[in-house]
């Protein structure tokens, strides 16, 4: 028998600490990259929106124009542009908007300090305006994500195990159909049956008009859940095709590997082979889509929210674009940029957790 090398406790502790240090260095390096990329994207977005011919000072004074004389209007207009710093260089305005340099009031009051700007459309700070739509978007997407994952993961695994059977063929046909149809077509079909024909769900809105509930009450929760049920069903159905096919293909690839054939040759039970061996190895490519779905909880769907008149982030973003409210649009864009950058780091780290063969530091 060969001698077994045993690592003394102090040395094993050093190796463990070394692994933790390597992980810490990797995370620190990625965080530095995230900060650099965030500043680059923020500057490009700010410069892009400033190329669009809009004038916040003119938009703010326009309602007062009929009551003002031309010379008085022009004088107020020039003064307001100076107060808003619109005549300064693009780089200066960007640095002021980000909070890198002091603002016009002599204070650091930008994006880095939590000041997301002022919405000219809604006449309130952007932070106050996005609070309610963000709550609605998260509320809807949590249910849609849980429902979609709860269906697609077991369905994809079952279709892979029973590849070529009638059930698998039927699911693949329906998946292609659902994947090919635009989501607004799916919305209209579901609205016709569930609202017009059967009258099960309300047509639009996120709560009953003129209904008075105490904030956070059970009645408010049930009413909101009733109103978002149809949008959640539409979002779930629209996402079934792509994710089911992705899970199925990953499982089929895993089931065709040599170690699965070896496990079956050893006489292991089929459930052990599928769920303990094949599923764990098939999970690595799937985890990207799963985490992307969870990160998408914060992102609103422009089409769904406009179709069903839901007060969410997607509809708010669309309103900001239509009304040229670029401080609102930029704030939403920067939030999604930060979520995407942090999400990419979480996806990379999750690879090392799911598959120990992956070297995170590489």
Outline where the language-model segments fall.
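Membrane-embedded alpha-helical segments of multi-pass transporters/permeases
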Residues: 38, 42, 46-54, 59, ...
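N-terminal Sec/SRP start-transfer signal
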Residues: 20-35, 265-266
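Hydrophobic alpha-helical transmembrane segments of membrane transport/permease proteins
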Residues: 38-95, 198-220
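Residue-level signal for discrete positions within transmembrane alpha-helices
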Residues: 34, 133, 137, 173-180, ...
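Alpha-helical transmembrane segments of integral membrane proteins
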Residues: 24-25, 134-138, 143, 147-167, ...
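An internal, D/E-rich "acidic patch" concept
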Residues: 85-153
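Membrane-water interface segments at the C-terminal ends of transmembrane alpha-helices
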Residues: 47-51, 174-204, 234-240
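Positively charged N-terminal leader segments that act as targeting/secretion signals
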Residues: 1-15, 20
